[in-house]
Swiss-Prot record:
GO BP, one annotated term: signal transduction
Signal peptide from the UniProt entry: none
Boundaries of every Protein kinase domain copy: 334-589
Family label: Belongs to the protein kinase superfamily. AGC Ser/Thr protein kinase family.
Stretches for region Disordered: 88-122, 174-266
Organism field: Dictyostelium discoideum (Social amoeba)
Alphabetical list of SMART domains matching this protein: S_TKc
Superkingdom classification of source: Eukaryota
Composition-biased stretches (Low complexity): 174-200, 209-227, 240-266
Name of the protein: Developmentally-regulated protein kinase 1
Gene label: pkaD
Length: 714
């Protein structure tokens, strides 16, 4: 693809004059850039190769950087001299032509002024070979070890973009230039002066394609070509420039084609808008294989995401869940289906919101089972934590409803069961699949630690899988929000995943216990077994040095080293204790793009290709096995009618017996009591199930919604 770039966006227009450009002094050329960041960006665009090897030490990096900058300065100096010579020649020719054209002096002066303004380093034609788009990472820490510190966020990396459906090429760009020239000629009373046309063509060729647009980053709706994707390797072609200039001169002689040119110009503007929209929302279908691959770049850890915005889709629409008014929502607004699971305090059921038709998970806790003060504290902590966190890899809690007998959590529904189910179905995962799963877990734990929350219950049973194959952490009953990063001393969690410092509660424990549990999970995912058995020997091994045995010989040394560093008995030596960036920077994650992984809504998850995931029809089974709350209400309304019909039948039967004059013997008092007892049981059997299922809907309840809520249930 070929395109015309407006100018170097990173070089100020007033920083170069003809005198400085002809001297070729390195210090003068260096002053073109506002800072070292802009110069580094130009280097990245000029050379299609890494600037230096990030594994080298600082001295070698400085030498390589200086050498690269010198070569760039020489290239820029030559290009600037050629450009200024061509522009000065054009200016002199235009001045001579102006003396012979008295009727168009004003137009020629304007054109000369525009060309004089173009002495400020505007690029001529740039030949593009491939289709690429720019990807700018979000803010990140500075690169250390260089002679000048360069912000990492300014380094732009190229991602392939499929623009096969967009008919944007150099010919269209030239057509737009021709149309602008013809429009200018018509505005000047259709004066077909070739010299004036040359001036207009030169001015418009060096400036932006649209005469009214400025050489800056345009919005998606502006009709410029500044946002057309380009490849960092570009070449300056003076021959192509002269050829296009001659073609423009010939096309300007056709002054009668103004209407046709306007139509072509409008079509080009529409295509340009479509191109800008395609850059804002990628036209390529995301693929799991190439999504996690990135160009060679330094592995630099960005700060953890603290505030996650509502999920947006590719078309710009918001998640439908955000349209629900949770403050006015009641528990009776949901239809309840089958059970998703049960625990010591309650059960989880599938439910559906009537207004939106969206599925949710309702976690119901029975107050009668929560008697101990420690249990009450865990429930209060869970509610306060779940209502105040929001992350793509954590189950979202939207609202809670409190009744005199029950507590209801309305949470995000992950319809592909949990990680333990898929691990049992596949026995173990491949190393690549495990890497993608663990990377998502790392982001979730990193977010919790940034909020001063210790998870303390990481295990495959608490890692749910959503419809796209991504992980979702759930069950924050054992989580603890600390103040100022202080340690906690309570002993809780699942024994197989407990860190040694939890068992030795004298000094307390902190956030590193989650990284220990992660090491156990990684070992379990790739081997299908736990590293420690549930025995006294296992307890002793956690307190002393141990040696893990990997029976699978195909595992790489990187994953073994990753597990060993996570399962360090000393928390101060454990990977991720002082900074989660040490986990991201581990060599096992060298091919993971963390920036892309943090925005996961447009791609399929790591489990989406497994047979256990594809064949998991949890929603359909639950809907087939259970009845909705609406159907239960209809049955409850129909019961009085059935009773009335039964009473009518009894009356008819009694009337028939009276007509036949049967003689009945009176029953004994004992038989009468038995008959009443049987009738009582019969009536209870008809209504018992409905009364039990709908008891919570008839009770007065209060609700708490997400968004900075602090609630105390007990």
């Amino acid at each position: 693809m070929s395109a015309i770039l407006n100018n170097y966006q990173y070089i100020p227009n007033n920083s170069l004059n003809s005198n400085n450009s002809n001297n070729g002094n390195n210090s003068t050329i260096l002053s073109l850039c506002d800072n070292a960041t802009q110069l580094m960006d130009i280097i990245m665009r000029e050379f299609n190769e890494p600037i230096f090897d990030y594994n080298q030490n600082s001295s070698e990096i400085n030498k390589s950087l200086v050498k690269t900058i010198k070569s760039l300065l020489e290239t820029l100096t030559k290009n600037l001299n050629n450009i200024n010579n061509n522009i000065n020649n054009n200016i002199s020719n235009n001045n001579n032509n102006n003396n012979n054209n008295n009727n168009n002096n004003n137009n020629n002066n304007n054109n000369n002024n525009n060309i004089n303004n173009n002495n400020n380093f505007n690029t001529p034609q740039i030949i593009i070979n491939d289709n690429y788009k720019l990807y700018t990472p979000p803010p990140a820490p500075m690169l250390k070890g260089l002679s000048c510190e360069v912000p990492f966020e300014t380094m732009e990396y190229m991602q392939p973009l499929d623009l096969s459906n967009n008919n944007i090429s150099l010919n269209n760009s030239c057509n737009m230039i021709n149309n602008d020239n013809n429009n200018n000629n018509n505005n000047n009373n259709n004066n077909n002066n070739n010299n004036n046309n040359n001036n207009n063509q030169q001015q418009q060729f060096y400036n932006a394609p649209s005469s009214n647009s400025t050489p800056s980053h345009s919005s998606p709706s502006s009709p410029t070509t500044s946002s057309i994707p380009f490849h960092p390797n570009f070449t300056l072609s003076q021959d192509n420039f002269n050829q296009q200039l001659q073609n423009n001169n010939n096309s300007n002689n056709n002054s009668n084609n103004n209407n046709n040119n306007n139509i072509i110009n409008n079509n080009f503007l529409q295509n340009s808008q479509q191109t800008n929209q395609s850059l804002q929302f990628s036209t390529t279908q995301p693929n799991l294989n190439n999504f996690y691959d990135i160009p060679k770049q330094p592995i630099i850890c960005s700060s953890p995401i603290v505030n996650i915005p509502p999920p947006f889709y590719l078309d710009g629409s918001i998640d439908p869940v955000e349209n629900i008014d949770w403050k006015r929502t009641k528990i009776s607004d949901f239809n309840f289906y089958g059970s998703l699971g049960s625990g010591s305090f309650g059960t989880a059921k599938l439910c559906r919101h009537r207004g939106s038709g969206l599925f949710f998970c309702s976690k119901t806790l029975r107050r009668e089972t929560i008697v101990h003060e420690k249990h009450k504290e865990h429930v209060n902590n869970e509610i306060n934590i779940m209502l105040n966190i929001s992350h793509p890899y954590i189950v979202k809690t939207y609202s809670t409803f409190n009744t005199p007998t029950k507590i209801h959590f309305i949470m995000e529904y992950a319809g592909k069961k949990d990680l333990f189910h898929h691990l049992r179905a596949n026995k173990c995962f491949t190393e690549q699949t495990t890497k993608l799963i663990v990377a998502e877990i790392v982001l979730a734990i990193e977010y919790l630690h940034a909020e001063n929350i210790i998870y303390r219950d990481l295990k495959p049973e608490n890692i749910l899988i959503d419809e796209k194959g991504h992980i979702k952490l759930t069950d924050f009953g054992f989580s603890k929000k600390t103040v100022g990063g202080k340690n906690t001393s309570s002993v809780c969690g699942t024994f197989d995943y407990m860190a040694p410092e939890i068992l030795n509660s004298s000094n307390g424990h902190g956030k590193p216990v989650d990284w220990w549990a992660l090491g156990v999970v990684v070992y379990e995912l790739v081997t299908g077994k736990l590293p420690f058995s549930n025995s006294k020997e296992s307890l002793l091994n956690r307190k002393a040095d141990f040696q893990l045995i990997f029976q699978n010989s195909y595992l790489s040394d990187e994953i073994k080293d990753f597990i060993f560093q996570l399962l360090s008995v000393d928390p101060s030596k454990r990977l991720g204790t002082f900074d989660s960036c040490s986990i991201r920077n581990h060599k096992w994650f060298s091919d993971i793009n963390w920036l892309h992984l943090e925005s996961k809504y447009q791609i399929d998850g790591p489990l989406s290709t497994l047979n256990s995931f594809i064949n998991c029809d949890f929603n359909i089974n639950l809907l087939k096995k259970s009845k909705s709350y609406t159907e239960q209400q209809q049955q409850q309304q129909q019961l009085p009618q059935q009773q009335q019909q039964q009473q009518q039948n009894n009356q008819l039967f009694n009337q028939t017996l009276q007509q036949q004059n049967f003689n009945f013997h009176p029953i004994q008092p004992q038989q009468q009591q038995q008959q009443q007892f049987f009738n009582f049981q019969f009536n209870n059997n008809n209504f018992n199930n409905n009364n039990n299922n709908n008891n919570n809907f008839n009770e007065a309840c209060t609700s708490n919604t997400c968004g900075g809520t602090t609630a105390s249930i007990f």
